[in-house]
Amino acid sequence: VEEIESYATRFGIKDNLNDLISSYSHGMKQKLAVIASLIHHPHLLVMDEPFVGLDPIASHTLKTIMQEFVSEGNIIFFSSHVLEVVEKLCEHVAIINNGKIVYDGNLESMNKDESLEQLFLELTNHE
């Protein structure tokens, strides 16, 4: 219970923990889903668009929590259409186009003069 309350405090929803989930906004449900996944202490998290519906403060909190999780030796796979976030958080990326992986590599090995967005546009023929 303490861990749930700790994460809920970090996400700013501690006062809502006794409310019905059906009354939660999309962002609050997203926060609750993250909390629910973390309290089991997994070594691997798979997240689909985890920043969708989050306000800037909650997004920052989630980024911090993700960085803490990885620094403890854990792994996160997540999908995102916000390439700037991917560039800031990830060491390794895969770009998928029409269901096929068209790039799979370490961000450090990318051309330093090219952003992830530029690489994405090139590989998906949207340049």
Locate each region found by the language model.
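A short, surface-exposed alpha-helical micro-motif characterized by mixed small hydrophobic
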Residues: V86-K88
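Helical segment within the ABC ATPase nucleotide-binding domain
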Residues: H60-E72
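ABC ATPase "signature
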Residues: D104-G105
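Conserved ABC ATPase "signature" region
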Residues: V1-N16
